[in-house]
Amino acid sequence: MKVTLVTALYDINRDKKGDGRTFDEYLSWFAGTLKVKSPMVIFVDESLEEFVREHRKGLPTKIICQSLEEIPYYHLNDTIQNILDDEEYKSKISDPGRVECKMSLYNAVIFSKFRWVKRVIEENTFNSEYFMWMDAGLSRFFAPHGVNINLPYPSKNAQEVLLDSKDSVLIQATMNFYGDLVNAEVCDESYFLDNRSWVMAGLWGGGAEVLTKFCDMVDEVLQEKMIKNNVINNEQIVMAYLYKNNDDMFTVFENYTHMHRQYEIIAELQA
């Protein structure tokens, strides 16, 4: 079985307008992520095309060049910025200093990942049965978890497990924080104003049918439940909301590490 990975990177001046992370940092992490030995579809501005070709040399790769203005959710940029500038929103949202509460472009990019994955599934360039999103900067977690980029990823054993669960969406959840959220039977829309993210959005996947459905559900929550109600938050919040209200469509890797946001699932996929 082939697993197709999907990733993307765009310069949105995050260091100046967001949280201080520089694009050079992301390029160094991106270079590591691009070394993963799996078929990969990569969305970038044409200015990064040669960078991608250099770091994917000899690996099965499809590069799709889109300008920032062409990404799937750029058309929502002004609408999202109007929400972020709204005083009522600022007074209600938890931790308004977060990058997703200041930069509309950040939101346009992070939510576009779901449209990108859906497109990759539809085109299925590498005839895959399973698809995974991997954040461009995820390689910064490789070394701490012992991931060897010289070995197949996911491993043969991991691919067999993924294939067996291809009718569900694979996510990682951090279980030892926010007990009121983790242990709740359902999640209501008040969570859209929360700042506590416990479902990781940097690595997730599934088979074509369930993942397409999931991406459509994210779109519905974003546009119908958040934006129409003058609210915006990050994609991790939306993923947790969908999981809690549709738990039968998910396979959850439960992470009990003492450090928040450690992607233990990265190592498991090479075991």
Where are these regions (language model features)?
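N-terminal anchoring/stem segment of glycosyltransferases
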Residues: M1-C101, A108, S112, V120-N127
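Short, flexible/disordered intra-domain loops and linkers
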Residues: N13-D24, A143-L151, M226-N229
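GT-A fold catalytic core of metal-dependent nucleotide-sugar glycosyltransferases
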Residues: L105, V109-I171
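Extended hydrophobic/aromatic segments used for targeting, binding, or gating
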Residues: N150-N195, K213
